[in-house]
Curated annotation (Swiss-Prot):
Its EC number is 6.1.1.23. GO terms for biological process: aspartyl-tRNA aminoacylation. Homodimer. It catalyses: tRNA(Asx) + L-aspartate + ATP = L-aspartyl-tRNA(Asx) + AMP + diphosphate. It comes from the Bacteria. InterPro entries: Aa-tRNA-synt_II, aa-tRNA-synth_II, aa-tRNA-synth_II/BPL/LPL, Asp-tRNA-ligase_1, Asp-tRNA-ligase_1_N, Asp/Asn-tRNA-synth_IIb, AspRS_core, GAD-like_sf. This is Aspartate--tRNA(Asp/Asn) ligase. HAMAP family: Asp_tRNA_synth_type1. Keywords: Aminoacyl-tRNA synthetase, ATP-binding, Cytoplasm, Ligase, Nucleotide-binding, Protein biosynthesis. The lineage of its organism: Bacteria, Pseudomonadati, Pseudomonadota, Betaproteobacteria, Neisseriales. It comes from Neisseria gonorrhoeae (strain NCCP11945). It is found in: Cytoplasm. Gene3D superfamilies: Bira Bifunctional Protein, Domain 2, GAD-like domain, Nucleic acid-binding proteins. SUPFAM superfamilies: Class II aaRS and biotin synthetases, GAD domain-like, Nucleic acid-binding proteins.
């Protein structure tokens, strides 16, 4: 019977006989004495086997990496000069008396301590990959976060209630994962994109405070921080306003960080959405980076430089500057790389001015400003740019000029890239946790392809008080009672006060050009129940995967999920998705128009 975990044996066990079980992490033969580093989920302990115990020695001699062993022996001090203060077990070793080979192991596809493994190899051999200490630490922290959330919400009076995994398909932005019904031929369930409507119905039912940690599913194009199935910390509460909900969830985030990382997050400042977009080009600004946009649209309306003037005059156009301290030393190669980078976001180029002498702002050949565009701008404009940006000698000023969406995304991404690459050495990056709330989101945004307004969050978000009439008369300026929790440039949680009156919900649907017939067909179960005395309610959902990725510093969200999908929504371990036989399809009343094609990742 095991008495101790390997990684938890310390000097307090000196002289005691212990039994440990785990995997051979490393085996070394030193002049007739065999050393085995035995590993389990808690860490590694060094085991010494000498020829005086012939049976144990023979077992150790036959063992190889990843063999599963049970070892009984006496705990003793390591010899002087061989200790490792970074490990709990670093000052002791076990002198083995008995060794039982519990299982042999084939040679693994990579060494457990190898850090240079391609992600595809890791995901194909995920079980072996999960043995690596970094993956064990990541998933242990994930567990600690989830348990911390449960403890906090339980103490706040929230009730854990499960909502259905098989539900009806409703439009919430992304495509649904559909599940054909065998019992009802030609009809489909959908896997939930979120428990949104069910948690609102739980409030109507009178449960007051609900939460669950649940799986959600979205069939969308994947990015580094997205998975087709993901885990959400979901909560909803009745009779509280947005300030009260933000206070509760902010307290939860602080408690989780304190318990898991011993980090004090401090207070969360609040920033209106309009301010976030104006200064940072993003609704999730990374406040570790002390760089801001400077608005130049008004200034460029009177300039002759076509690139800037055209953007300033176009409907929805924008011209901004981004001053980077000490950036004049950027090489031509670096600027070319940044130009290529902003092109990913639709920018057609990247204009810049290097400030060599802010006292000489002419646009002639002797100018203290170095740039191909200086000669196209008036001296008044150059002076105004320097004043507005507060540029100093040695700075560089980058420019974005295009539709506001392109400028915000391109220059916003450039701000992050430059800040992370050069900010620490030049005083505009602070390596600490920087949380905030982004509030006062627009209720709607215009979708040019669909030629109509769509909901920024979802169509169940309540308009800000006094903005209800704007839903019809001026939807572009209608604000929502929505709020996002942002941490170091990541949205880790988003929520809103919901619509609790059926008539107001109908107005929102009308503003979104959803007909009464479509409203009833898709959302009748919600509208019908809102009529039975629905309380004011609101909530928030955290992305657990994203939160743990931030807390661990993992490179990818896939490093904090036990069995993730690739960016092509495949599981390389199980080879899913896979084709099914015709009998299964017939039982579901389905016939494929196109057979499966080979798209598996190599």
């Amino acid at each position: 019977m095991r008495t101790n975990y390997c990684g938890l044996i310390s000097e307090q066990y000196l002289g005691q006989t212990v039994t440990v079980k785990g995997w051979v992490h490393r085996r070394r033969d030193h002049g007739g004495v065999i050393f085995i580093d035995l590993r389990d989920r808690e860490g590694i302990v060094q085991v010494v086997i000498d020829p005086d115990t012939p049976e144990a020695f023979a077992a150790a001699d036959s063992a190889r990496n990843e063999y599963v062993l049970g070892i009984t022996g006496r705990v003793r001090n390591r010899p002087e000069g061989t200790t490792n203060d970074k490990m709990i077990s670093g000052k002791i070793e076990i002198l083995a008396k008995e060794i039982e080979v519990l299982n042999a192991a084939a040679t693994p596809p990579f060494q457990i301590d190898d850090e240079n493994i391609s992600e595809n190899v890791r995901l194909t051999n995920r079980v072996i990959d999960l043995r690596r200490p970094v993956m064990q630490r990541n998933l242990r922290l994930r567990y600690q976060v989830a348990m911390g959330v449960r403890r906090y919400l339980d103490a706040q009076g929230f009730i854990d209630i499960e909502t259905p995994m098989l539900t009806r398909s409703t439009p919430e932005g992304a495509r649904d994962y559909l599940v054909p019904s065998r019992v009802h031929p030609g009809e489909f369930f959908a896997l939930p994109q979120s428990p949104q409507l069910f948690k609102q119905l739980l409030m109507v039912a009178g449960f007051d405070r609900y939460y669950q940690i649940t799986k959600c599913f979205r069939d969308e194009d994947l990015r580094a921080d997205r998975q087709p199935e993901f885990t959400q910390i979901d909560l909803e509460t009745s009779f509280l306003n947005e300030d009260e909900i933000m206070d509760i969830t902010e307290g939860m985030a602080k408690q989780v960080f304190k318990d898991a990382l011993n980090v004090d997050l401090g207070d969360f400042p609040r920033m209106p959405y309009s301010e976030a977009m104006f200064y940072y080009g993003s609704d999730k600004p990374d406040m570790r980076i002390n760089l801001k946009f400077t608005e130049l649209t008004d200034l460029m309306k009177t300039e002759e430089f076509k690139v800037f003037r055209g953007a300033a005059d176009m409907k929805g156009g924008r011209v901004v500057a981004l001053r980077v301290p000490n950036g004049a030393k950027f090489s031509r190669k670096e600027i070319d790389e940044y130009t290529k980078f902003v092109g990913i976001y639709g920018a057609k180029g990247l204009a810049y001015i290097k400030v060599n002498d802010a006292g000489n702002l002419s646009n002639g050949e002797d100018s203290g400003l170095q740039s191909p565009i200086v000669k196209f701008l008036s001296e008044n404009a150059l002076k105004e740019i320097i004043e507005r940006t507060a540029a100093q000698n040695g700075d560089i000023i980058f420019f974005g000029a295009d539709k506001a969406k392109v400028v915000n995304e391109a220059v916003g991404a450039l701000r992050i890239k430059v800040g992370l690459e050069h900010g620490k050495d030049n005083g505009y990056f602070t390596d600490e946790w920087k949380p905030l709330w982004v509030v006062d989101f627009p209720m709607f945004e215009y979708d040019e392809e669909a030629d109509r307004y769509v909901a920024v969050h979802h169509p169940f978000t309540a308009p800000k008080e006094g903005h209800e009439d704007l839903m019809v008369s001026d939807p572009a300026n209608c604000l929502a009672r929505a709020y996002d929790m942002v941490l170091n440039g990541w949205e880790i949680g988003g929520g809103s006060i919901r619509i609790h009156r059926a008539d107001v919900q109908g107005k929102v649907f009308a503003a979104l050009k959803i007909s009464p017939e479509e409203q009833q067909e898709k959302f009748g179960f919600l509208l019908d129940n809102l009529k039975f005395g629905a309380p004011p309610h609101g909530g928030l959902a955290f992305g657990l995967d994203r939160l743990v990725t931030l807390m661990t510093g993992a490179e990818s969200i896939r490093d904090v999920i036990a069995f993730p999908k690739t960016q092509r929504a495949q599981c390389l371990l199980t080879d899913a998705p896979n084709s099914v036989d015709d009998k299964q399809l017939r039982e579901l009343s389905l016939r494929l128009r196109q057979k499966a094609v080979e798209t598996k990742e190599a």
